[in-house]
Amino acid sequence: MKVKSYLKPLIGLSFFTSLFFTKVNANLNLHNTYFDRCLKKYNQEKYELALKDCNKAIKAHSKWGNTFNNRGLVHLELGNFESAISDFKTAMKLSNAMFSAKNFGNIAYAYESLGNYQGAIENYSKAIEIRPNLGYVLHGRGWVNMEIGNFEEALDDYENAIKFYSKGELRDMDAVFWNNFGWIKENLKDYKGALNEYNIGIKKDPTDSLIYANRANIKFELGDEEGACSDYKKSSKLGDEGNTEWLNSKEGKWCKNMKI
C-alpha cells in the first residue's frame, strides 16, 4: 500500500516581503496576489487552478523559493513528478537551503512515485542527514526500503518514524502504516511482532480486508488455526476476492467448514 505525501505548502510571504519592497514593489505585489491565490486553490484541492496562479506568481517574480516549492507540491498532486522535482530543486537554490530537508523529502516522494527507488532513498537520506527527526521522511524511506526488500533498513526507519512523528502528524500512523510495519516484521520472521502491528492496524481501521488477511497468515504460522480461519472469513466478508476464492477451493475447505 502506498504512503501519501504529507508535506504541506510552506507559509506565505507576509513575514518576508518587507525585505524586497524597495526594489521590486510592483512585481512583488502582483506576485503576492497570485501566490495567495495559488495557496488558496491548493487548500481547496483545485490543483489545475492553483497551477495557473503559481505560474503567474513566478512570472511576476521568479526569485522566490517558496513559490517554486508550492508549485512543486501542486505538480505532485497532479502527477507531474518530473516538473515537481525541477521546482523543488529550484526552490532549494533560491532559498539558500532554508527548506532543504523538506524539499529533499518532496523530491524523494516524486522519485518514489516515478518508480525510481534509488533516487528516492538518496533524497530521503539527504533530508534525514539534515533533519534526522522528521517522522514522515523516515516513514517514506522506510516504505521504499520495504518495497525493494530491504526489510532490516525498513524496520529501522519505521521504528525511528514512530519516535519522531510529532503530535500533529500522528494521524499519518494510520492502518496502512501499521499494516506495512507488520509486513516488514513478518518478512523478518518476527511473527509475534507482526501480529502486534496487525492488531493495531485493525483497531485503526476494522474494515481493511488486507490487514485481516495478513493477520490470518500470521496466526496460521503461530498455530492458531481457529483465529486464522476467523480472519480469513472476515477478510472475505470485507471484499477480499482472493480469500473468497480460497475458501471455496479444496485448500480452504477446512476453514470454510469450521464453525466459529
Enumerate the language-model features and the residues they cover:
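Alpha-helical tetratricopeptide repeat
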Residues: 2-260
